[in-house]
A protein has these predicted regions:
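Extracytoplasmic copper-binding redox domains, predominantly the cupredoxin/blue-copper superfamily
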Residues: 24-203
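Bacterial N-terminal signal peptides
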Residues: 9-19
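Bacterial N-terminal signal peptides that target proteins for export
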Residues: 1-11
Length: 203
């Protein structure tokens, strides 16, 4: 019985040490996206495209895209493949959200219909790619859902800065998507600390 009493805390301590080591080992990618021929460095999606060869748990919590003052908020939303997005209508008028394709595949087109203020429509994005959000009622509205293969992603601020946290150590390929620029890929090696990268997106 004494051996059991002594061993149990040792097992627990070892498990805690391993868990702590795993948490400490996670790194982060801090970067900046420069642009050429594009009016703004804001709202550019940056995500790990390859290198994380595993299946990820889909978040139970839904991501919310609001419709406010005749705009999609946020304009660009990145989600892990399989995530459900709730499209909320905060405007006093009805909206009809649809996308004509996902990355050019018209078979993935979808129309959510029209709904009034205060209500929301959910949709689960199971296909990788980019859905260009439009509104049948208000043609001036536009937004984007970028469906990524990993949960390691970010959207640039107005100065082009971004930060991707809690990335396991490894060799990865970063990829960008922007409304007006061509995609850019760059390899990055992530360790236990922070790694800095700089990307240039051209029209």
């Amino acid at each position: 019985m004494k051996l059991l009493r002594i061993g149990a805390p040792l097992i627990i301590a070892s498990a805690l040490a391993l868990a702590t080591a795993g948490a400490v080992a996670a790194g982060e990618i801090k970067g900046k996206v420069n642009v050429q021929g594009i009016k703004s460095a804001a709202d550019i999606a940056v995500y790990i495209d390859t290198g994380a060869d595993k299946k990820f748990d889909v978040p139970k919590e839904h991501v919310v895209v609001d419709q406010r003052r005749m705009t999609f908020v946020p304009k660009v939303t990145v989600v892990l493949q399989g995530t459900t997005v709730d499209f909320l209508n905060s405007d006093p008028v009805g909206h009809n959200v649809y996308w004509p394709s996902i990355s050019g595949n018209k078979k993935l087109a979808h129309n959510l219909g029209t709904w009034p203020k205060g209500e929301k429509k959910p949709f689960q994005f199971n296909d990788l790619g980019v859905a260009a959000l439009l509104c049948n009622v208000h043609p001036e509205m536009s937004g984007y859902i970028v469906v990524a293969p990993t949960p390691y992603f970010a959207v640039t601020d107005r100065d082009g800065n971004f930060e991707i946290k809690n990335v396991p150590p490894g060799d990865y390929t970063l990829k960008t998507w922007s409304e007006d620029g061509k995609p850019v890929t760059q390899t990055v090696k992530v360790g236990a600390g922070s790694v800095s990268v700089e990307l240039t997106v051209k029209k």
